[in-house]
From Swiss-Prot:
Database matches in Pfam families: His_biosynth
Annotated localization: Cytoplasm
Swiss-Prot/TrEMBL catalytic activity: 1-(5-phospho-beta-D-ribosyl)-5-[(5-phospho-beta-D-ribosylamino)methylideneamino]imidazole-4-carboxamide = 5-[(5-phospho-1-deoxy-D-ribulos-1-ylimino)methylamino]-1-(5-phospho-beta-D-ribosyl)imidazole-4-carboxamide
Name by which UniProt lists this protein: 1-(5-phosphoribosyl)-5-[(5-phosphoribosylamino)methylideneamino] imidazole-4-carboxamide isomerase
UniProt family annotation: Belongs to the HisA/HisF family.
Keywords: Amino-acid biosynthesis, Cytoplasm, Histidine biosynthesis, Isomerase
Any Gene Ontology biological process: L-histidine biosynthetic process
Organism of provenance: Pelobacter propionicus (strain DSM 2379 / NBRC 103807 / OttBd1)
Active site: D8, D129
Gene: hisA
Lineage, opening ranks: Bacteria, Pseudomonadati, Thermodesulfobacteriota, Desulfuromonadia, Desulfuromonadales
GO molecular function, one term: 1-(5-phosphoribosyl)-5-[(5-phosphoribosylamino)methylideneamino]imidazole-4-carboxamide isomerase activity
Gene Ontology CC terms: cytoplasm
Amino acid sequence: MLVIPAIDLKDGVCVRLEQGLMDRDTVFNDNPASQALEWQNQGAELLHIVDLDGAFAGTPRNKAAIEAIVKAISIPAQLGGGIRDLATIESYLSLGLSRVIIGTAAQRNPQLVKEACAKFPGRIVVGIDAKAGMVAVQGWAEVTGITAVDLARKFEDCGVAAIIYTDISRDGMLQGPNIEATRSLAEAVAIPVIASGGVSTLKDIENLMTIERSGVTGVITGKAIYTGAIRLHEAIALTGKDNQE
């Protein structure tokens, strides 16, 4: 199981939000590229970047910071936030990003996901954010009437590389991930699932490792590695042992 460090960008700096609320942010580093390099040096094999301003605005907002991150690291990086059309996807992939994440647009325009997968095979990830099992969009500002499982099933046959599943009520709260909801989603589809939201201790990662066989292939961690609640290199060592058995 991959442990994937997150870099959330707001106004060009590295922040963390509580429950996706833009007015509840903490700045952790004003140099996102140096932060990305730090996670790479601790053993990260993949970086997760979110353009928070883009997620709320619906268009890219932190391109300079994203470009600086990609230039600084040699590991793959994936990006989400404000990606609503093929032109934006193409523009980001041309910067050197390995994968892009379609979130709000996946719910509002499933055809975009299908077209993107056809044009950029293996490089499209769907981000599904849910509150009490229901999909939330527009930077989590709006909860829809569709379940996370029903949305995931729409993309079963179009070549999505992975689904990132975030339980919003857990995100940034350091309360532990929603194991059962993550397992249910992973078992409902054949697409690999990456868990996100609420990971606060190594024990949380151990708990997620118990559902790896259900199709959970990675875990994104943000706030916990910035506050020191989890040391990234220790989490990577923990999951690495599991990978070698």
